[in-house]
UniProtKB/Swiss-Prot annotation:
InterPro entries: PI-PLC_domain, PLC-like_Pdiesterase_TIM-brl, PLCXD1/2/3, PLipase_C_PInositol-sp_X_dom. GO terms for biological process: lipid metabolic process. Residues 17-193 form the PI-PLC X-box domain. It comes from the Eukaryota. Gene3D superfamilies: Phosphatidylinositol (PI) phosphodiesterase. PROSITE patterns: PIPLC_X_DOMAIN. One of its GO terms (molecular function) is phosphoric diester hydrolase activity. Pfam families: PI-PLC-X. This is PI-PLC X domain-containing protein 1.
């Protein structure tokens, strides 16, 4: 690909012999919990947090919320900046605030976001309009506090917003197929309410180690590879996960400092991976703080497509 330091149009610059490969057999960089760069410092904790945390937040918000922000924030760059870096998989955790009379949807990870779903996805549409040969996989999940009617409202908004850019789930999406039909968005919707919508793909499996030690994360991912990859889209998560004990034992740390310390080890593992249809091949590779060292991590993932297995 030309312009090796610029990845905002990397799909359009892929060599022609890769245009007909299904996207689930390519290496695609993704961001874990993509919208946590805009968490609301003034927000109460989300309803998905443990009950004890909700009680503590009620009486000691000045202590609880800064701590949650340190460990719930997984990204720094705005969604359009992530796309500019080459990210083509967005991990969106949707929520409706409890007792909120307005039918407004937010993102949640410990606390709620400042940006609404409408604002964020409108930004994605604007970006796609300027990069007409790029394809983004958007995985929506969690749906905290949502009932069936709210699911229907959200689904109708998604279809109206992305409209003809949506790639139907009946298609085997390659770059060429998407370009031929002007498809730019693959919507994965992890809820039974999506049944019957040709525009919505099923859940995108996410390999999550739930470990704070990067060596254990790598060990988990290797175990998953040995069991065999899914037949379609799936994501391997490089993200580290703290537990209550880790947070208490490391009061001066944050998720970002933990990620920085583990970055080189995780990237060394990425360099050894290969995309493709084989049992041990990877597809989407997700990371926290995707711009922490510029475009290096996305460059590594995209570069895997140029290596012959």
């Amino acid at each position: 690909m030309e312009d090796e330091d610029c990845y905002e149009d990397w799909m359009s610059k892929m060599p022609s012999h890769m245009w007909d490969i299904p996207l689930w057999n390519l290496a695609i960089p993704g961001s874990h919990d993509s919208m946590t760069y805009c968490l609301d410092k003034q927000s109460s904790v989300s309803n998905s947090t443990p009950r004890v945390v909700q009680v503590l937040d009620k009486y000691f918000p000045c202590i609880v919320r800064p701590c949650i922000m340190k460990w719930a924030t997984t990204q720094e760059g705005a969604i359009s900046n992530q796309l500019d870096l080459g990210i083509r998989f967005l991990d969106l955790r949707i929520a409706h605030k409890i007792k909120d009379p307005d039918e407004v949807f937010y993102f949640a990870h410990g606390v709620y976001s400042l940006l609404t779903v409408k604002e964020a996805l409108t930004e994605v549409v604007r970006w796609l309009d300027q990069h007409i040969k790029e394809v983004v996989i958007i995985a929506l999940s969690n749906f905290e506090g949502m009932n069936l009617d709210q699911h229907k409202d959200l689904i109708q908004f998604l279809i109206a917003t992305f409209n003809k850019k949506i790639c139907p789930k009946s298609v085997t999406p390659s770059l060429q197929e998407c370009w031929n039909h002007s498809y730019q968005v693959i919507l994965s919707y992890d809820d039974e309410s999506s049944t019957g919508y040709v525009e919505l793909w099923p859940q995108c499996p996410y390999w999550w180690a739930n470990k704070s030690d990067p060596n254990l994360v790598i060990s988990y991912l290797e175990d998953q590879k040995n069991e065999g990859r899914p037949s379609q889209f799936f994501a391997a998560g490089l993200n580290l996960t703290e537990d209550a004990r880790y947070v208490l034992c490391h009061p001066c740390q944050s998720l970002q400092s933990m990620t920085r310390r583990s970055y080189s080890l995780l990237m060394k593992w990425v360099k050894q991976q290969r995309p493709g249809s084989g049992q041990a091949c990877l597809n989407i590779i997700c990371a926290d703080f995707v711009g922490i060292f510029g475009s290096e991590s996305t460059q590594l993932v995209i570069g895997l497509n140029q290596i012959e297995a």
